[in-house]
Amino acid sequence: LLDTDFSIEATAATTTAGSGSKVAEASTSDYRVAVFGAGGVGKSSITQRFVKGTFNENYVPTIEDTYRQVISCNQKNVCTLQITDTTGSHQFPAMQRLSISKGNAFILIYSVTNKQSFAELVPIIEMMKEVKGNAIAETPIMLVGNKKDEESKREVSSNSGQKVATNMECGFIETSAKNNENITELFQQLLALEKKRQLALTMDDPDGKNGKKKGCHIM
């Protein structure tokens, strides 16, 4: 589906917010992805599982962390996937707005075991509409229900998540950072939604079959 395939190199650089990185300096461009969601839904776990391949059982609240994954193109172009793991607290709205204004794409995460975390995405969505304006229509967005491994504790059905994603006209997937389920697929589908650049991860799904290349509209 995509003419240009990108592959992830074996090494990735991780930085905290505000710090520099040799990876960033070597890149011709950054593709900035901001990850939003309530505290404890697994934002850091999903990001670290994707970038580092690791999972930490202990919950450590995040103010803001930035992870950079080097992506190389078949045509030898260099692109850096910059993933910002944002705070789950409502105490830092200015930081959230800044992440939205700079972001090229967004991942909205809730826990399938917590209805409240599902509801807490609403103010983030409203802020995205306010900050991005009409540009939100062409912005790739994935709605993610994490912790699908805890099925016995589920409070949000898959159908509920899919209905919201359908209304938003964006991507939807359920993941388990703990079991490394659908983590790579999440980022594959996110990049497949990008219209302005042809981006793809040449891993399990080189043709981007799991993602539909379309814009995301928030009503």
UniProtKB/Swiss-Prot annotation:
Signal peptide start and end residues: none
Residue ranges the record assigns to the propeptide: 217-219
MF annotations from Gene Ontology: GDP binding; GTP binding; GTPase activity
Main location (coarse class): membrane
Keywords (A to Z) from UniProt: Cell membrane, GTP-binding, Lipoprotein, Membrane, Methylation, Nucleotide-binding, Prenylation
Coiled-coil region(s): none
SUPFAM superfamilies named among the record's database cross-references: P-loop containing nucleoside triphosphate hydrolases (SSF52540)
Outcome of substituting residue 45 to N: Probably nucleotide-free or GDP-bound. Reduces paralysis induced by aldicarb treatment
Annotated PANTHER family: RAS, DI-RAS, AND RHEB FAMILY MEMBERS OF SMALL GTPASE SUPERFAMILY
Record-given protein name: GTP-binding protein drn-1
